[in-house]
């Protein structure tokens, strides 16, 4: 493969859409605020949904009023930690339990109390980073051709001053 010369960038302070359309995420630079935070990257042009979850064994049960999902649908999801443990971020097929709850089968097992926060999207989850308390820029370079986003790159941040991406 030849060198790609049409790499572009996008910069944002806060949560939001970084770029729409089919692109490959090549590089991510972010700066923390001095408080531990997180950055979650999704393949979507719409804001991911905030919900709560619990895990028992391999089963993660997500609660969101009127979630509107159907059994067999795939969601990209990332989870906050409870007592330094979280469910495994990724892309999962859902089983609808009620109009307000659905479940996914985690890759790992354990117990996590209910009412722990999570974020999901009907687009794909691409990557996540938990940040420490350092106030210095960090860079994540994605090897090869980068991470493919079919729809766009939407970033959800907590305690992040800014993020910059390079894509092509």
Residue ranges and their predicted role:
Residues 26, 35-40, 73-75, 161-163:
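Short beta-strand/loop motifs in extracellular/secreted proteins, especially
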